[in-house]
């Protein structure tokens, strides 16, 4: 009684108390899971083959899933750590790709809304654990590819939060994933190394199995993280992934014309010494 509290004073007090008593629900969730002896971890090296139905001998798919899961855990415990790759589930529509990601991280910590307003987008990235780029094959232009490449590359974002007066650098707590149907979703070959593609074809994901084994999967990722396992592919697997991504790159419009030209002229032109682009264009 007798004190006058201005709006500025009230806001500053609210922010001070919030910062002093900050709370991270995902940290608490993972720490409780880690200490729960009743939960037996899944095999971190076989998550894709066990739960997505990829071939058991497909080590690349299993390894891509493994580094994604470790990256999820690491971003929680080491906010803003380097994790510039995106796990992509490719397959027919309706097989449960997005539902897999939503179940995995929990609906409250999942987002698939790519806001056009950059500030809203950066705020959303700060409040989720898994951000899905749904229907990745819809982002077909070079501009789209550049924006997504920029999003994946950053480990912190500079913006002003609500009620704050100045911009500040905010380390990221979340990682990206993606889903797609078509096979030509990579518009920029220079940035394709960031996409780890697991091709499911038309295989339906057993979502009940994911729900029942979600905690085992996440606990396996926690244990792997605690052991110091990496959230990125080794050089051999990265080369395999980059080579595999060529199957999903958009064809340059000149390539089909060049193919037709070489095919139609195969009987009347000697190609053994090669040919120049000028020759192909003129003839």
Each language-model region and where it sits:
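Feature primarily recognizes SF3-like P-loop helicase cores of small DNA viruses
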Residues: 2, 8-25, 82-85, 112-114, ...
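P-loop NTPase catalytic core of nucleic-acid-dependent motor ATPases
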Residues: 18-130, 277
């Amino acid at each position: 009684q007798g004190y006058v509290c201005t709006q500025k004073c009230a806001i500053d007090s609210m922010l001070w108390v919030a910062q002093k008593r900050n709370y991270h629900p995902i940290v608490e969730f993972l720490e409780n899971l880690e200490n729960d002896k009743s939960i037996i971890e899944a095999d971190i090296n076989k998550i894709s083959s066990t739960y997505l139905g990829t071939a058991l001998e497909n080590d690349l798919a299993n390894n891509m899933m493994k580094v994604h899961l470790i990256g999820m855990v690491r971003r929680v415990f080491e906010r803003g750590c380097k994790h510039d790759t995106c796990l992509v589930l490719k397959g027919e529509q309706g097989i449960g790709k997005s539902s897999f990601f939503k179940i995995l991280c929990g609906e409250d910590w999942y987002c698939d809304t790519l806001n056009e307003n950059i500030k809203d987008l950066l705020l959303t990235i700060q409040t989720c654990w898994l951000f899905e780029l749904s229907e990745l094959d819809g982002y077909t232009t070079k501009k789209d590819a550049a924006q997504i490449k920029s999003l994946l590359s950053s480990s912190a974002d500079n913006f002003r939060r609500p009620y704050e007066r100045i911009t500040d650098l905010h380390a990221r707590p979340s990682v990206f994933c993606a889903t797609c149907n078509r096979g030509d979703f990579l518009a920029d070959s220079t940035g394709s190394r960031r996409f780890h593609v697991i091709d499911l074809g038309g295989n339906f994901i057993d979502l009940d199995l994911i729900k029942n084994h979600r905690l085992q999967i996440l606990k396996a990722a926690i244990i792997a993280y605690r052991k110091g396992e990496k959230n990125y592919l080794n050089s051999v697997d990265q080369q395999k992934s980059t080579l595999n991504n060529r199957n999903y790159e958009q064809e340059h419009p000149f390539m089909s014309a060049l193919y037709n030209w070489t095919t139609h002229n195969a009987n009347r032109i000697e190609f053994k010494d090669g040919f120049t682009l000028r020759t192909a264009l003129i003839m």
